[in-house]
């Protein structure tokens, strides 16, 4: 489908650049207007099963209902922008190697409600399928309750914070290494690089 093609192209772009992560939500009809929570869960899992494995992508579970102040209406909006925003917020209040999920840094703002609110069992299903559930906890707000990347096999890189840490490290090492170009390849130069 077109959705899978877009997701695959975004992943290919992120993997080619190797300096970013693609945040993706399921197609709108997977959760918006779906009466049964179990059906919405299966729709989300099915949507992302067609997308290739990658540590450069992050999947979320749906849409939030929010006020669109520019058009003066309430509407459902995909959560991928919010998840990217939580990563930026985490950088601001902590560091890239902290998880953007949970009650400390994973609060999704501006949500009136979710297109569907997965139960604990459904959250477990989603998490096993590489999807980060976003859940409304009564009295505590809407929270990103997972920190997986879209990688299918177990690895350190199947966590958002680990992938983001390595993006930061790779960039820092590349910046430092360029100043060692055309220098003598001797013990002094190597020690200087190690001690940067």
Identify the function of each model-found stretch:
Residues 1-196:
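Structured, hydrophobic secondary-structure cores that serve as assembly/anchoring elements
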């Amino acid at each position: 489908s077109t959705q899978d093609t877009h997701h695959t192209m975004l992943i290919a772009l992120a993997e080619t650049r190797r300096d970013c992560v693609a945040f993706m939500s399921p197609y709108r009809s997977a959760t918006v207007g779906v009466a049964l929570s179990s059906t919405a869960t299966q729709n989300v899992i099915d949507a992302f099963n067609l997308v290739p494995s990658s540590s450069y992508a992050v999947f979320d579970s749906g849409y939030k209902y929010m006020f669109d102040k520019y058009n003066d209406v309430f509407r459902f909006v995909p959560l991928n922008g919010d998840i990217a925003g939580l990563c930026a917020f985490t950088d601001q209040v902590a560091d890239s190697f902290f998880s953007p999920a949970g009650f400390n840094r994973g609060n999704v703002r501006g949500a009136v409600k979710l297109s569907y609110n997965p139960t604990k069992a459904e959250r477990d299903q989603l998490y096993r399928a590489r999807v980060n559930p976003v859940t409304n906890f009564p009295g505590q707000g809407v929270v990103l309750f997972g920190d997986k990347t879209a990688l299918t096999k177990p690895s350190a890189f199947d966590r958002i914070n680990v992938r983001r840490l390595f993006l930061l490290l790779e960039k820092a090492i590349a910046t430092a290494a360029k100043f060692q170009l055309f220098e003598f390849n001797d013990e002094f130069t190597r020690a200087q690089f190690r001690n940067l």
